[in-house]
Swiss-Prot record:
Protein name: Tryptophan synthase alpha chain
Assembly and oligomerization: Tetramer of two alpha and two beta chains.
Residues at the catalytic site: 49 (proton acceptor), 60 (proton acceptor)
Keywords: Amino-acid biosynthesis, Aromatic amino acid biosynthesis, Lyase, Tryptophan biosynthesis
The gene coding this protein: trpA
Function: The alpha subunit is responsible for the aldol cleavage of indoleglycerol phosphate to indole and glyceraldehyde 3-phosphate.
Enzyme Commission no: 4.2.1.20
Family, as annotated: Belongs to the TrpA family.
Lineage: Bacteria, Pseudomonadati, Pseudomonadota, Gammaproteobacteria, Pseudomonadales
Keyword S-adenosyl-L-methionine: no
One Pfam family, short name: Trp_syntA
Source organism of this protein record: Pseudomonas fluorescens (strain ATCC BAA-477 / NRRL B-23932 / Pf-5)
NCBIfam families in alphabetical order: trpA
Length: 270
């Protein structure tokens, strides 16, 4: 089994959801970002999404757009992001790590080279928001052939006619964007999320992770009762943006991660 399959299976046995954390690689700089990345598992992150910085992150809200700007300003690129994964893997062989971003940097790096280097570095999955299933042959198929999961986003506007197509070729888990729009937007209602999860379960056996708008341990716990994974990104990145030092950035992110993890872990305890 892949690291993602193993982790979600373990958590199912424990009757709890995964805490999935998102940070942008190289934000605010390489060393601070690597320290955050290395600290996330001990702070309670079950799965890590690592953003690949890009100049035009159109699906992301202001917090992650600014994170991209900070990372690019610190000279982060795809090669350095893969190096960061390699350094993370030197001390962690079991936490699933997923790269998330846009196709443009991968295209410029070269798809075959990227897949080979990502696999060698220890990448477990990809979320590429601007690669619809109609283009599976360009990245999804070769990535999966190399043993890298390809995770799809679904949204409130993905109707029943479109959903099977979106899920075609998906692996690892399904990422449900609970608010239509950009990342970090307002939280969805629990009733809406519950209905969406039920609809997705009719179409797939993959674990379902919910993201966009989750900022507090209480919100994370509420989602953890309904879904297999709880994704938090913008709330963590806000701590990097407001930090006055590298130490403050690391401490702020890891402290919030620990609080979110506690919320997720207690969510299903009666």
């Amino acid at each position: 089994m892949s690291r993602l399959q193993t982790r979600f299976a373990q958590l199912k046995e424990q009757n709890r959801a995964a805490l999935v954390t998102f940070v942008t690689a190289g934000d605010p700089n390489y060393d601070t970002s690597l320290a955050i990345l290395k600290g996330l598992p001990a702070a309670g992150a079950d799965v890590i999404e690592l953003g690949m910085p890009f100049t035009d992150p159109m699906a992301d809200g202001p917090a992650i757009q600014l994170a991209n700007i900070r990372a690019l300003g610190a000279k982060q690129n795809l090669a350095k992001t893969l190096q960061m994964v390699r350094e993370f893997r030197e001390g962690n062989s079991d936490t699933p790590l997923v790269l998330m971003g846009y196709f443009n940097p991968i295209h410029h790096y070269g798809v075959p080279r990227f897949i080979a280097d990502a696999k060698a570095a220890g990448v477990d999955g990809l979320i590429v928001v601007d690669m619809p299933p109609e283009h599976n042959s360009e990245l999804c198929d070769p990535a999966q052939a190399a043993g890298i999961d390809f995770i799809r986003l679904t949204t409130p506007t993905t109707d029943d006619a479109r959903l099977p197509k979106v899920l075609d070729g998906s692996s690892g888990f399904v990422y449900y964007v609970s608010v239509a729009g950009v990342t970090g937007a307002g939280a969805a209602t629990l009733e809406h999320v519950e209905e969406a999860v039920a609809r997705l379960r009719r179409h797939t056996d993959l674990p379902i992770s919910i993201g966009f708008g989750i900022r507090t341990p209480e919100q994370a716990a509420a989602i953890a009762r309904l879904a297999d994974g709880v994704v938090v990104g913008s709330a963590l990145i806000d701590h990097i943006a407001s930090a006055e030092s590298s130490e403050q950035a690391v401490d702020g992110v890891l402290s919030l991660c620990a609080a979110l993890s506690e919320g997720v872990r207690k969510a299903r305890v009666s």
